[in-house]
C-alpha cells in the first residue's frame, strides 16, 4: 500500500506541471514557428490587458511616419534562454527595422514556458535608411510648412463634415482622420511667422526714430552733385540698413550700401534729399506693410473657403476622404528584416 501511494505521488509530481498543455489556450512558445501580426489589431489577454500587435516604441524615423500593414516573425531557434525571431515586412526604402522584440503573455506567470494563444505582439523601433536621412536633410522648412498647411486644411474640412441632415441616404459623414493637435500646432506656427515678419520689419523697414531727421542736404551730403561734404569733420557712414544702428557721429549721414533710403525713413514726410517735409506729412511707415499682409491673409482665407465650399442646395453624399499627409517620395519598397529576442509579460 505504501508503495502504491509513493508511485501515485510521483505520478502527480510529473503530470501536474504539464497540465496546462491540455488547455487549448496554452501554447508552448518553442513550438510556435510563425507569427503573423497586423496593424490595428490587438493581442489576446488573460492576466493583463491587450496590447497592439504592432507597436512602435521610437527610432530616428519617428513612429508616425510609417507603420507596416503586416509583419511576419519566424522562430529561428533558441539561444539557450529564449526564442529568437526574424521579423519581415514590406517597407518603403526610406525606413528599416531597428530593435525588434516579440512580447508574449505567460499563461500562468511571466516565466511560464507556456504562453497564451494569440497574446504575442511585436515591439520595434523604426529607423531611417541612408536614403531616408538624405531626404530628411534636404526637406528643410518647406516640408514642415507643407505638412502644417495641409493639416490646417484637413481640420477645416473636418469641422464642416458633420453638418449634414441625419436620417437620409445622403447623410454626410464626418471626417475622422484629422489629428487633434492641429489647432495648437497651427497657433504656434502662425505666432512664429508673425515674429519673423516683425523682426524683418524692425530691422529693414521701420522708419527712423529718436529724433533722426532723414538725410538732409545741409548735414554733410551735397545734393547738387551727389558728393559727400566732409567740411563738418564727419566721414561717410558705414554700410548698413538703417541709420538707427550707426553711432552718434553718423546719425544724420547718408545711408550706406544697404536698402535704399525709401525704406529707412518715413515715406510721407520727405520729398528727397533736400530735407524739406511735405505739408501735413504723417510718420507711420509701417501701416502699408501690416495692412497689406492682413488683407492678403483675409483674401486668401476667403478664397480657400469658397473653393472648398460645396454648391448651395447640393445634399449629395460625402465620404471619409480626408487625405493623409503627403508621403515622402522614395525609390520604392522592399522586404525589410529585423532580428530580436522574446519578452514575456
UniProtKB/Swiss-Prot annotation:
Keyword RNA-binding: no
Protein name from the UniProt record: Store-operated calcium entry-associated regulatory factor
The family this protein is said to belong to: Belongs to the SARAF family.
InterPro entries linked: SARAF
Matches recorded under PANTHER family: STORE-OPERATED CALCIUM ENTRY-ASSOCIATED REGULATORY FACTOR
Pfam families cross-referenced by the UniProt entry: SARAF
The organism of origin for this protein: Danio rerio (Zebrafish)
Region span, Disordered: 155-178, 223-289, 302-345
Ranges facing Cytoplasmic side: 205-345
GO cellular component, one term: endoplasmic reticulum membrane
Residue spans of biased composition, Gly residues class: 160-169, 278-289
Source taxon at top rank: Eukaryota
Transmembrane segments: 184-204
Keyword Aminoacyl-tRNA synthetase among record annotations: no
Function: Negative regulator of store-operated Ca(2+) entry (SOCE) involved in protecting cells from Ca(2+) overfilling. In response to cytosolic Ca(2+) elevation after endoplasmic reticulum Ca(2+) refilling, promotes a slow inactivation of STIM (stim1 or stim2)-dependent SOCE activity.
Signal peptide: 1-21
Bilayer topology: Single-pass type I membrane protein
Amino acid at each position: 500500500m505504501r508503495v502504491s501511494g509513493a508511485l501515485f505521488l510521483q505520478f502527480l509530481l510529473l503530470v501536474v506541471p504539464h497540465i496546462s498543455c491540455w488547455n487549448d489556450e496554452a501554447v508552448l512558445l518553442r513550438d510556435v514557428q510563425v507569427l503573423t501580426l497586423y496593424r490595428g489589431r490587438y493581442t489576446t489577454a488573460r492576466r493583463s490587458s491587450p496590447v497592439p500587435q504592432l507597436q512602435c516604441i521610437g527610432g530616428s524615423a519617428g513612429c508616425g511616419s510609417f507603420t507596416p500593414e503586416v509583419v511576419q516573425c519566424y522562430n529561428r531557434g533558441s539561444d539557450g534562454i529564449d526564442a529568437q525571431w526574424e521579423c519581415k515586412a514590406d517597407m518603403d526604402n526610406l525606413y528599416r527595422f531597428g530593435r525588434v522584440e516579440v512580447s508574449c503573455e505567460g499563461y500562468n506567470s511571466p516565466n511560464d514556458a507556456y504562453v497564451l494563444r494569440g497574446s504575442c505582439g511585436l515591439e520595434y523601433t523604426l529607423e531611417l535608411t541612408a536614403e531616408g536621412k538624405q531626404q530628411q536633410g534636404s526637406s528643410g522648412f518647406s516640408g514642415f510648412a507643407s505638412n502644417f498647411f495641409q493639416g490646417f486644411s484637413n481640420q477645416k474640412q473636418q469641422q464642416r463634415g458633420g453638418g449634414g441632415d441625419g436620417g437620409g441616404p445622403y447623410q454626410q459623414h464626418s471626417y475622422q482622420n484629422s489629428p487633434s493637435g492641429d489647432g495648437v500646432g497651427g497657433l504656434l506656427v502662425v505666432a512664429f511667422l508673425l515674429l519673423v515678419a516683425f523682426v524683418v520689419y524692425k530691422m529693414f523697414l521701420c522708419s527712423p526714430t529718436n529724433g533722426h531727421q532723414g538725410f538732409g542736404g545741409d548735414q554733410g551730403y551735397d545734393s547738387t552733385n551727389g558728393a559727400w561734404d566732409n567740411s563738418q569733420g564727419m566721414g561717410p557712414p558705414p554700410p548698413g540698413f538703417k541709420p538707427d544702428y550707426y553711432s552718434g557721429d553718423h546719425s544724420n549721414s547718408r545711408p550706406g550700401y544697404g536698402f535704399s533710403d525709401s525704406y529707412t525713413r518715413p515715406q510721407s514726410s520727405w520729398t528727397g534729399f533736400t530735407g524739406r517735409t511735405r505739408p501735413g506729412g504723417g510718420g507711420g511707415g509701417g501701416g502699408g506693410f501690416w495692412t497689406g499682409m492682413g488683407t492678403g491673409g483675409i483674401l486668401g482665407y476667403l478664397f480657400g473657403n469658397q473653393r472648398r465650399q460645396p454648391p448651395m442646395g447640393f445634399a449629395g453624399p460625402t465620404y471619409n476622404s480626408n487625405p493623409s499627409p503627403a508621403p515622402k517620395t522614395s525609390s520604392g519598397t522592399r522586404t525589410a528584416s529585423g532580428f530580436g529576442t522574446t519578452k514575456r509579460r
